[in-house]
Amino acid sequence: MAIKTENFILNIGPQHPSTHGVFRLRIVLDGEVITDLEPVFGYLHRGIEKLAEGRTYLQDIPFTDRLDYLGSMTNNHAYVMAVEKLAGITVPERAEYIRVILDELQRIASHLAGLGFFLNDLGALQTPLLYMFREREKIVELFDMCSGQRLNYNYYRFGGFVQDLPEEFLPALKILLDTLPGFIDEYEQLISTNEIVLIRTKGVGVLKRDLAINSSAAGPVLRASGINWDIRRNDPYSIYNRFEFDIPIAKNGDTYDRYMIRILEMRQSVRILRQAVKDLPEGEIMGKAPKLLKPPAGEVYSRIEGPKGELGFYLVSDGTDKPYRWRVRPPCLLNLSALKDMVVGWKVADLMAIFGSIDIVMGEVDR
């Protein structure tokens, strides 16, 4: 007589060090193998979209910092660009260059944090994380110079910036650009050919091309599955069409490819930054924008390529100083929706390696 067995339901979280926020995973196990997964989120819901509809357009900028708080600069950019499009505000050329510089620095800083935490989840405790935070600290110091903040920068404004970059910013940035490629080489020497990392990541947590498209995956997760899609190239915004850079694409869609895409993207960000610093013009940093903004009635959707993927803002104006509708398209939520396709069939021991490779920030998921 065959022995009857039952699947085991295991809850991970909502307070777990590898979820990087309050988030619960409800997984169904057949022995050690995952047969089903349900992500349970909402623990960090703050009602940001509804709160934003009760405040002026300017007062809503700090809300964007608190979505993906590891990508605050790009969040600022996505939102102010949507409002500028809605209100017909022109941004000076110098301000556009500064925005590209800050966006690419933010991309590198976000990837450094994401990769450090990912390797921590793999079991490489502390050492790779501290190596990567060593370089991230230099970027945070640059952000501190221009915004006065190390987190939640609130630096962008409609039409540009209130304050120009301080004079010590560019010399410090040039030093960083000279040294950062060598440190990325160091990361690769330590990690990319490490036997344990390869065993834990190669062929693990594969997201197939069609599933990546069907789940609306974004950013490095999408490109690791072989989809050549990056808003900077496919729907250029700001002045990205002036720069030469490549879009890293992988083909296997596994945990290793998602790691490698971020390594390659940091190299391309350095390439963009060097061009932007070289071509940075003099001039105004603030376009003509009223202090109390009342965009004409209408609606707009604007998107950028953030560190985690396509970040979009949908705004509806009724002609007053407050938005009638304020909606975020968060890449972290979309990437999280693809998690089940990645983990089913793998052992529970592989779960955190796969989850860490999609680099989720719950502030953006729950909003």
From Swiss-Prot:
Pfam families the UniProt entry points to: Complex1_49kDa (PF00346)
* GO CC, any one term: plasma membrane
Location in or out of the cell: Cell membrane
**Its catalytic activity?**
a quinone + NADH + 5 H(+)(in) = a quinol + NAD(+) + 4 H(+)(out)
Name one molecular function that GO assigns to this entry: NAD binding
Judged by the first EC level, this protein's enzyme class is translocase
Question: Does the keyword section mention Transcription?
Answer: no
Name the EC number(s): 7.1.1.-
Membrane topology, as annotated, equals: Peripheral membrane protein
> Which of UniProt's keywords are assigned here?
Cell membrane, Membrane, NAD, Quinone, Translocase, Transport, Ubiquinone
Q: Does the keyword Protein biosynthesis apply?
A: no
Assembly and interaction partners: NDH-1 is composed of 14 different subunits. Subunits NuoB, C, D, E, F, and G constitute the peripheral sector of the complex.
Q: Which family does it belong to?
A: Belongs to the complex I 49 kDa subunit family.
Role according to the record: NDH-1 shuttles electrons from NADH, via FMN and iron-sulfur (Fe-S) centers, to quinones in the respiratory chain. The immediate electron acceptor for the enzyme in this species is believed to be ubiquinone. Couples the redox reaction to proton translocation (for every two electrons transferred, four hydrogen ions are translocated across the cytoplasmic membrane), and thus conserves the redox energy in a proton gradient.
- Please give the HAMAP family that the UniProt record associates with this protein: NDH1_NuoD
Under which name does UniProt file this protein? NADH-quinone oxidoreductase subunit D
Organism name = Dehalococcoides mccartyi (strain ATCC BAA-2100 / JCM 16839 / KCTC 5957 / BAV1)
